[in-house]
A protein has these predicted regions:
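Helix-to-loop junction immediately C-terminal to a conserved catalytic motif
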Residues: 53
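Conserved ABC transporter NBD signature motif
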Residues: 61-69
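ABC ATPase NBD coupling module
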Residues: 70-87, 224-229
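Conserved ABC ATPase signature
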Residues: 134-144
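Hydrophobic anchor residue at the start of the ABC signature
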Residues: 148
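A short, proline-enriched helix->beta-strand linker immediately N-terminal to the Walker B motif
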Residues: 153-157
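Catalytic Walker B motif of ABC-type/P-loop ATPase nucleotide-binding domains
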Residues: 159-162
Length: 232
């Protein structure tokens, strides 16, 4: 398996006010999977996504990516691993306002010895005619495409997306999700999306439902599931 999460636990607060955010989380993904972490606010999905990305330190358990146990890495090694293997897309685009589209995307290539062909990538993103524009000149969907390009330019093994369409309208959201599907198929990038949106599960081949910090349901072959399996 490409990604293995085993017996993962995470809590916040002191002993007296301890809140268990993730409890005994276990699952695995093969390379090229498109997985949704589905759950309401407070279910632990964003914390789990951040733990996989090395942004949250876990209390116990292990996270293994491509045979690297990232939960045991020192901070410097973890930072290097994150830069080399992982890409991040967030709800807010975090583009550099004084850089153009092409310059914002190039920022992601500076830390990789063999970045993706930027012209080809920008065309795949549908941004070629906007490549010399600044973020303030772009729509929300175009800004998110630019953020996706910045994450992809370094050829990440895993793309971690935290509510990537929550700030977008319905049509733009569908366009972004369609783009992520194309990226998954074309580049065989493993994609994990944390979301509360049931619609996004339609694009995934693995659905992991979280509720109160535990995996409530893990559906591994979405194409053959019964509709009732998507219910809580």
């Amino acid at each position: 398996m490409f990604l293995v999460v085993k017996d993962l636990n995470k809590a916040y607060g002191t002993k007296e006010n301890k809140i268990n955010v993730l409890k005994d989380i276990n699952f695995s993904l093969e390379k090229g999977s498109l997985c949704t972490l589905l759950g309401p606010s407070g279910s632990g999905k964003s914390t789990l996504l951040n733990a996989i990305g090395g942004l949250e330190k876990i209390d116990s358990g292990s996270i293994v990516i491509n045979e690297f146990e990232i939960s045991n890495l020192k901070q410097k090694d973890l930072s290097n691993f994150r830069r080399k293997y992982l890409g991040f897309i967030f709800q807010f685009y975090n583009l550099i306002p004084d850089l153009t589209v092409i310059e914002n995307i190039q920022v992601g290539s500076f830390i990789h010895n063999n970045p993706m062909d930027i012209e080809k990538l920008i065309k795949d993103l549908g941004l070629w005619e906007h490549r010399n524009k600044y973020p303030r000149q772009l729509s929300g969907g175009q800004q998110q495409r630019c953020a996706i390009g910045r994450a992809l330019i370094k050829k990440p093994e895993i793309l971690l997306c935290d509510e990537p369409t929550s700030a977008l309208d319905y049509k733009t959201s569908k366009d972004i999700l369609s783009l992520l599907q194309k990226i998954n198929k074309k580049y065989e990038t493993t994609i994990i999306i944390a979301t509360h949106n049931e619609e996004i599960t339609k694009m995934a081949n693995i659905i992991i439902r979280l509720k109160d910090g535990i995996i409530y349901k893990n559906i591994e072959n979405v194409e053959v599931i019964d509709a009732q399996e998507l219910e809580w």
